[in-house]
Amino acid sequence: MMDFKAKLVSVKELTHDVRMYMFERPAGFSFKPGQFVMLQVEEVARAYSIASSPLELENFVLIVKLIEGGRGSEYLRAAKAQDEISFKGPFGHFYLDEDSERDVVLIGTGTGLAPLYSILQYLLESGSEREIKLFFGVRHEEDVFLREEFEDLSQKHENFSFKIILSRPKSGEKGYVTDLIKEENIENSEAYICGGKAMVDDVKEFFTQKGISPEHIKHEVY
């Protein structure tokens, strides 16, 4: 863990309220796929998961939902390229088990996708042959982000597939990530779950009922 400043390189709008912030990665800053950093705003600290792979040495990325009036959100909303931002980290025990050979199931809702994206990129960039399935849930079509990136990755890597589900669509299929995973064969899987508490609890219970032991069910509540 270290205190450091990182220069903001770029800001990309992913949805109406989600932004991708890319920072220069300072020398000596290392992390495991799935961990988070604390953004320092005066006397207040806010936790944000790193959404990039540790193998990306030049930069690191945060995916942030901007909340009206939120200290971290308002600070980042006003941030401009070349600004230096104060951080502390990395933190967290929600990270990839690199020694496992089990299939990987990534389940996320909203910006709970961020640490899962880090894990996904790391696995694919490191040449892992483990089967990887991603299940991503949001409310509306306009809340979906990174779809094109997932489509591109799934075309390049035969061991990766993904599904996106909407809980409040204007039309078409409606459901939750818990509905999606019930259709899957997860016997030899390791689950990484990140999102709201109700979803995390439901998915944990499902994997437990399927006989997956606790050490193979990793979770973080957003």
What are the residue ranges of the model-derived segments?
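Short, conserved phosphate/pyrophosphate- and ester-handling motifs at nucleotide-, phospho-/glycolipid
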Residues: 34, 112, 196
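A short, basic/flexible loop-to-alpha-helix module at the beginning of a structural domain
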Residues: 89-101
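Conserved S-adenosyl-L-methionine
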Residues: 101, 122-132
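Reductase modules of NAD(P)H-dependent flavoproteins
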Residues: 135, 139-222
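Histidine-anchored nucleotide/phosphate-binding helix
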Residues: 113-125
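Ferredoxin-reductase
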Residues: 2-83, 139-140, 168-169
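Phosphate- and divalent-cation-binding pockets in alpha/beta enzyme and binding domains
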Residues: 95, 115-118, 145, 202-203
